[in-house]
């Protein structure tokens, strides 16, 4: 039974073909393919038309899929012109791919579909069923509705199945040569031993002289970096349910308790064990044995029950609330402890059920839930007051904005004022994406100081809203050279230090490559202990290390990179070797490569088909 419950939750199986998404067109509703006498079409592929009606339906399917993937962000993207255009083009491209594959399957004289297969598909199609049986009348009515003959309909089904078989064959037939397998495994199992030496920036370099002319040239070239950003001073009010002081009388708590008394009671629960078998005769035999030795229930459940979960727990399926007990078990009328049912038919299998325990429902006393009810009442009152105030503010902003400050005063809510801030120093309470978008949008506030600024009302989620008024504003302005001169000199010294350290490091590497260590030792450098680097390491140097050639005949390979602290690191590649993968690891790698290979094959076929085909687009949607 537990197996059945889990199956219901996992009843939808999503199949996909790697790399190529056909938008479920391969065996999609055939009716939208049949009627070729349409007035509008979106494209022709080698003379075969793709109807605009079909495009609209597939576009709708794709949009629904996007909704599920993007969730709440869907509506933000759906109004984006580029996003909409990309979706149009994507759907159209997949429709064209589908037609190309159909034509390819036909030209290859692909395996002819057996007539019995076609017959089986039609006979088992739900739309042609009546009372769980094939209805010829429904079938003929359907053909009439789509303006098709029986022969045309069968040919369409054949075309769809041939295309599906083609895709299936391609996806199954890809392979990797044994030699290629070995090379890839060897490449992925490779490890490298390195040593590192850190070349730090010499502090004395920071004392180098920088002329006034150098500083001025840098200032002029990088003026965009020397602006004082625009600044804001804001009046704001944060409205939350916490703004209100709420009182709650004992009578209110008592009334709430009486009104919602069912919420404060626990329902009766029952604990059952089951034995589930597929054969009725086996169930009857087990029941007969239990009549003689009921204490064997757990043992039999463990040994013979087909339910994979409860059989491991001696048949125990746990506690079930009285309102959630399946009807089949309810009708067995088990009311006594250790009472065993007769054989119960259950979803093509058979159950024997035992009642282990019963837990009677209880009613909580008011003192047990007093604090919880008090909290609920306060939350409700706060929410009601918040919504009332929110609506009042919203209405007055439209009709009489001058009243806003009086409304706030009546509710003992103070207007707060910020200090000057810019985009990098926004107060924490206002550091919310929607608020920042509003504050820094110059079109939404008045910079003319002769006009009195007005409040703007922004409603957020979770019962929170803000009244915001831009009180003062300062435009960004260029800083004077003298005010930033010290910072520029410091910056130029650092740039020079980096250049000189890099030059020195490159000279050391050249020396080491020639087999000399004099400059290395003069710089008081040393190599760290050996490190083993794998291709799967997430280190910043992994790609650098594996881009180096193999050391030859005892010679080491050297390279240089700059770390996050601006130090230069000399890397010495000492050794390259391979480890052995387990068979399981090899299979995982080869399976991934096989899938990737499938994608390449599909893309190659489609690219070739497009190049050889005549595809014409109509001006119905953006191409």
Swiss-Prot record:
Protein name: Periplasmic chaperone PpiD
Entry function: Chaperone that functions as a gatekeeper on the periplasmic side of the SecYEG translocon. Facilitates the translocation of precursor proteins across SecYEG by interacting with the translocating substrate. Also plays a role in the release of newly synthesized secreted proteins at the periplasmic exit site of the Sec translocon.
Major subcellular site: membrane
Domain PpiC: 267-357
Single GO MF annotation: peptidyl-prolyl cis-trans isomerase activity
Entry GO CC: plasma membrane
PANTHER family: PEPTIDYL-PROLYL CIS-TRANS ISOMERASE D, PERIPLASMIC CHAPERONE PPID
Membrane disposition: Single-pass type II membrane protein
Periplasmic topological intervals: 33-623
Topological domains annotated Cytoplasmic: 1-11
Subcellular location: Cell inner membrane
Segments passing through the bilayer: 12-32
Quaternary structure note: Interacts with the SecYEG translocon. Binds to the lateral gate of SecY. Forms a complex with YfgM.
Gene3D superfamilies: 3.10.50.40, Porin chaperone SurA, peptide-binding domain
Keyword Cell membrane: yes
Family as reported in the entry's similarity comment: Belongs to the PpiD chaperone family.
